[in-house]
Regions:
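Basic, low-complexity segments
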Residues: 1-56, 432-435
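Basic, low-complexity intrinsically disordered segments
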Residues: 2, 42-69, 73-141
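Short acidic (Asp/Glu) and glycine-rich catalytic loops that position anionic groups and cofactors
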Residues: 8-12, 47-49, 110-112, 210-212, ...
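Hydrophobic alpha-helical scaffolding
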Residues: 17, 21, 118, 122, ...
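Function-dense linear segments that define catalytic or interfacial modules
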Residues: 39-43, 50, 78, 236-241, ...
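Polybasic low-complexity intrinsically disordered regions
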Residues: 90, 99-101, 108-307, 312-314, ...
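Helix-centered, glycine/charged polyanion-binding patches within enzymatic domains
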Residues: 188, 296-376, 380, 479
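Basic, amphipathic alpha-helical segments enriched in Lys/Arg and hydrophobic/aromatic residues
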Residues: 251-257, 344-456, 460-479
């Protein structure tokens, strides 16, 4: 028989030994250790100090280090909203310890996160990004020789049905009802009007329509192919290490190639500041991008700076006689670079590293559908997300794991490897006394079949480096 459990009445005094201890969370302990390795707390406080009053009047503000740590929790826990981040930090004992709060302390509310976000200017977020980028450079994770650039899509916190006409201020549904009435449909019949709206060809433009709740959001196409209000995040990534060199959110109706040279040169500025080198130092040798970035004027600017443009031409069999001599030379150099063996290798690395950077931030980091409004707010959050992604790369360098899921997968992988070794050892014992050549051939077959089965049943890809070292050890022992 069980005993019903309910919340006991509150007590006036509680012994310290009776308090709940934080659960051991190796990931956040390693994250804190990584932050301490480059003195993140003191440097972040000095960067944020100008945004706070020095008079000492009133209630002291929340430590900005706590604010950035809470954003890290949101990134690693896949929580997009500030309300959700605040609730998670308040509920978890281990995260409270990571933030520096005990059981009796009150963690910051979601409204506090909003106030701090608005208080800190964009330049502070940029400096925090450079602070972590500098830490990557000290561990050899910043080369800055070959870079790749690409954009993705963020769904805005705004609805298409809330659009207003810029000229007449007519609401979207009023506009649809008027069109339905002109086509002989009763405007009071909601189902008929919705059916009419679903079947009619959409001809909405950003020049004609605006969302009153988020004027910066633009009408565009999402990753799923649907029409929605969107923004465009952009990354410039180091193709040798995968580190994000420059990140920003752009308006959803901007062309990809707009200001390409400016964004690449901004990445170079970030590299110079992170490496503490001269402002005119140029380390970038090549830029890889897809066809959407093919713009003659932008490529001409990059080539004039001595940067190789590995960008495919979207126009097949382009007639260069329609271009002037200088533009034709720029297009020819870009095409030659994209078709070369080294250029194709850079394009493959570009696809790998850029997808690897977008997926943790947008899909696993909860930023694919934003809860914020306004280009400035999105840029602040996205800059921090890019910095945290770089921080996870540094953790992978130091500890072999960069996210809580990777830490959990590593533990499972080690268990599966141990089980595979035990089974292989059992097979070795059974095969004693046989021909050594037959034993080695049969043993290898059993080993890799066993490991392949374990990987298929468990963590695909996690055992790759473990199985490789295991094979080398078996070869060296002559089994």
């Amino acid at each position: 028989m069980f005993k019903p459990h309910s919340l006991p009445p509150p007590e006036l005094f509680i012994a310290c030994s009776s308090l709940v201890r934080p659960a051991t969370t190796p990931f956040y302990a390693k994250l804190d250790q990584t932050l301490n390795s480059f003195d993140f707390a003191d440097q972040a406080r000095s960067l944020c100090a100008p945004a706070y009053s020095e008079t000492g009047r009133g209630r002291p503000g929340i430590d900005p280090v706590v604010y950035f740590k809470m954003l890290m929790v949101g990134f690693f826990e896949d929580i997009a909203s500030e309300r959700g981040i605040a609730e998670r930090c308040s509920d978890s004992i281990s995260i409270r310890a990571f933030l520096g709060y005990d059981l009796t302390g009150t963690t910051p509310d979601h409204s506090t996160l909003s106030i701090i976000r608005q208080r800190l200017g964009q330049e502070i977020y940029e400096q925090v990004f450079l602070l972590i980028l500098s830490a990557l450079d000290k561990h050899g994770l910043l080369k800055g020789k070959h870079v790749g650039i690409d954009t993705s899509v963020i769904q805005a916190n705004a609805a298409l049905k809330s659009l207003l006409n810029r000229n007449t201020e007519e609401a979207y549904w009023e506009y649809v009802r008027r069109l339905a009435s002109e086509n002989g449909i009763d405007p009071k019949n909601t189902e008929a009007v919705r059916e009419f709206d679903r079947k009619r060809p959409k001809k909405m433009s950003n020049e004609e329509w605006v969302n009153p709740y988020d004027p910066d959001a633009k009408i565009g196409v999402t990753k799923a192919g649907a029409t929605d209000m969107i923004y465009k995040p952009e990354h410039t990534v180091d193709l040798d290490t995968g580190a994000i060199l420059q990140a920003e959110v752009r308006l959803g109706d901007e062309a990809d190639q707009k200001d390409l040279s400016l964004h690449v040169l901004q990445a170079q500025v970030n590299i110079n500041q992170a490496q503490n080198t001269a402002a005119d130092n140029l380390t970038i040798e090549s830029t890889a991008a897809d066809k959407g970035y093919h713009a003659v004027a932008e490529m001409k600017q990059l080539q004039a700076e001595g940067i190789r443009t590995v960008i495919s031409d979207p126009v097949k069999n382009r007639k260069r006689e329609n271009l002037d001599i200088e533009d034709a030379r720029v297009v020819r150099k870009a095409k030659r670079s994209a078709c070369s063996k080294s250029g194709k290798a850079l394009l493959r690395r570009r696809g790998m590293h850029l997808e690897r950077s977008f997926a943790p931030i947008l899909d696993a980091g909860g930023a694919r559908r934003t809860t914020l409004r306004g280009l400035v707010n999105l840029n602040k959050r996205f800059k921090v997300s890019a910095a945290i992604y770089n921080l996870s790369q540094l953790m992978r360098k130091l500890f072999g794991v960069g996210t809580p899921k990777q830490l959990a997968a590593m533990g499972k992988a080690l268990f599966l490897l141990w089980r595979a070794i035990v089974m292989v050892g059992r097979d070795l014992w059974r095969m004693r006394g046989t021909n050594p050549a037959e034993r080695q051939s049969s043993l290898y077959d059993k080993i890799w079949l066993r490991l392949a089965r374990e990987v298929a049943n468990g963590t695909t890809g996690t055992l790759g480096w473990i199985s490789h070292s295991f094979k080398k050890s078996l070869t060296s022992t002559g089994c």
